[in-house]
């Protein structure tokens, strides 16, 4: 029976799947670079979603079957009425981190070039907007300075706001296999709860919810004051060290009270981080879905920038997404504040560049306010 190579649509790992058109059992794709043939329980059950009884096989309009032409005409007429009555701001698209990159690009172009509206957003807004803002604030662009292989090469992995064992199981399996092969590899978990990811961890810090910034401020000060700053990296690749340290010192002294952690536990965390140059700090929704999500992400990124532990194998700050193509949506600009290729909707020069490239005079001037 023919098999089709595809991707699991669930978590951010995006595992490779071998599926059969007849709805037979699925299998992991051993050639896939992220999963290497592994599937979790949800991925293994994908075939159960392909049964025909409950699937919509044809377009429907008002609950009745329609041809594709009739359905598309209905959608187009709806957009025409909205544009005539309310202008471009009367239209909107809501898309998903489960779309293919090409589909994401087409949807974004439909909204911004054809409809003339910046009213397109993705459910990635909920899971990744804080990381997007933190990356942009730290690096100037929304770029992730790490790959999955870094987890296997690191001497220390720090999980922040991530129950990797349950939420990204195949990636956790890769981490567990790496630790089994190198027992000296350390794992620290920062999470108010004791989750499955804490099993076998070197250290668990049950910090008070929302106190991550204080903990990483304490770490930043410890690294600087104990000689772990990379002076050459700081001079050539960064700016703003002194005001950052000043702000961190104002918080670091209160870290035990703010985090609810014993000073000895904070010291143990800082010491482990300092002693292991090859460190990956991996964060997910426990950081992002927060009123201070951007500040939390920047606080941990700053610790990597201070020490130069970024941009080399086995080290760096690493944001993992909630869905397999959240990054693809960001790359094609399918958010109300972004344009294709990491261009920004709030930069007139970026708008002009894309308007010329797309030949799209209707491209909106600014993001949704």
Regions from the PLM with identified roles:
Residues 57, 230-239, 260, 313-325:
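Short alpha-helical "patches" and their helix-cap loops
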Residues 1-226, 244, 262, 304, ...:
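N-terminal export/assembly segments and adjacent metallocofactor-ligating motifs
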Residues 92-100, 257-261, 284-291, 323:
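Conserved short loop/turn motifs at secondary-structure junctions
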Residues 84-88, 120, 184, 225-229, ...:
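Intrinsically disordered or highly flexible coil/loop and linker segments, enriched in small
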Residues 157, 200-201, 250-253, 283-287:
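Flexible glycine/proline-enriched surface loops and loop-helix/loop-strand junctions
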Residues 245-247, 266-279:
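Core structural elements
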Residues 154, 226-263, 340-353, 357-362:
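N-terminal leader/propeptide and maturation segments of large enzyme subunits in energy/redox metabolism
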Residues 274-369:
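A glycine-rich, hydrophobic/aromatic-adjacent loop/helix-cap motif
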């Amino acid at each position: 029976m023919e098999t089709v190579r595809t991707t699991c649509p669930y978590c951010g790992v995006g595992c490779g799947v071998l599926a059969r058109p007849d709805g037979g059992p699925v299998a992991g794709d051993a050639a896939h670079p992220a999963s290497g043939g592994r599937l979790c329980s949800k991925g293994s059950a994908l075939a159960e979603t392909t049964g025909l009884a409950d699937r919509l096989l044809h377009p429907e309009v008002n609950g009745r079957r329609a041809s594709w032409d009739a359905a598309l005409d209905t959608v187009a007429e709806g957009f025409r009425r909205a544009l005539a009555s309310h202008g471009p701001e009367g239209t909107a698209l809501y898309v998903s981190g489960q779309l293919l990159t090409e589909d994401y690009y087409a949807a974004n172009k439909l909204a911004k070039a054809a409809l003339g509206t910046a009213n397109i957003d993705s459910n990635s807004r909920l899971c990744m907007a804080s990381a997007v803002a933190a990356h942009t604030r730290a690096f100037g662009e929304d770029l992730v300075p790490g790959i999955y292989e870094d987890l296997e090469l690191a001497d220390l992995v720090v999980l922040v706001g991530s129950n990797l064992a349950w939420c990204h199981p195949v990636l956790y399996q890769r981490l567990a296999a790496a630790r089994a092969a190198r027992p000296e590899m350390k794992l620290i978990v920062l999470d108010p709860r004791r989750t499955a990811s804490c099993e076998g961890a070197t250290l668990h810090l049950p910090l008070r919810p929302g106190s991550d910034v204080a903990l990483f401020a304490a770490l930043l000060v410890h690294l600087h004051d104990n000689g772990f700053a990379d002076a050459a990296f700081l001079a050539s690749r960064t700016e703003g060290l002194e005001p950052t340290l000043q702000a961190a010192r104002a918080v670091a002294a209160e870290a035990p009270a703010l985090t609810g952690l014993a000073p000895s536990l904070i010291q143990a965390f800082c010491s482990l981080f300092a002693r292991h140059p090859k460190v990956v700090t991996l964060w997910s929704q426990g950081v992002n879905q927060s009123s201070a999500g951007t500040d939390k992400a920047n606080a941990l990124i700053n610790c990597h920038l201070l020490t130069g532990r970024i941009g080399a194998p086995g080290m760096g700050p690493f944001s993992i997404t909630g869905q397999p193509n959240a990054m693809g949506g960001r790359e094609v600009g399918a958010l109300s504040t972004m344009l294709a290729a990491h261009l920004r909707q709030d930069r007139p020069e970026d708008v002009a560049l894309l308007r010329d490239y797309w030949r799209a005079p209707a491209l909106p001037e600014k993001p949704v306010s």
